[in-house]
Amino acid sequence: MQRDELKALREDVVARAREAFARMDEVAEFNTRKVLDAMRACRISDAHFGVSAGYAYSDLGREKLDELYARVFDAERALVRTQFVSGTHALATVLFGILRPGDQLVSITGAPYDTMQTVIGWAHESVGSLKEFGVDYDELPMQDGHVDMDGIDRIVTARTKLALVQRSRGYSEREPLSIEDIRVVSARIKAANPNCIVFVDNCYGEFVDTVEPTELPDVDIMAGSLIKNPGGGLAPTG
């Protein structure tokens, strides 16, 4: 390919991608402003960045970090810790914190990724899994990369305690769920069982839109990972 052809190809690709990049810039600017506004509202100061030795029951910086995340993600409360070694660890904490023996967990977005299957324990035996704990499990296969909306009515019943919605594609080839997708799916779950807890796995989904799942009326709880979007590649764990 000659230089002029390469130049023309580059200009064509840049022109076609310009709208998408402009949208990304808008989202980044919106979320930057939202975080800064939240930091001002929480009155974050230098004192909150001080190192704590851990010899106390309270930690001013830790408490403010929780408050800040709750405000940014429009949640009632937030728990942000580097002691969570990964997103899977955070997700497992939610599941084990809510579910009890005899409860039913349903995955609305098909089979979760491998590390979550180890936590659940139904695809293969694993020590300390939800299955071993006595939690029942079922999953709704995706249809051509999309959530089976009619299937939600069948799989979510009166005994379903928690419905898991995985936003990212994980290791599959399906498209990730948009905020509008999550809005529609969570509303359908609540229509099938108003008492079912809607839990969104938001790993890789933080700050990619101007609305977070916890801002939606039918999403009850969400978990993500500091080592992905929020940490910007800087957080060692979380």
Language-model features and meaning:
Residues F49-L79:
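Active-site-flanking structural segment that lines cofactor/substrate pockets
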Residues L79-V80, D138:
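Structural signal for short hydrophobic segments within the conserved structured cores
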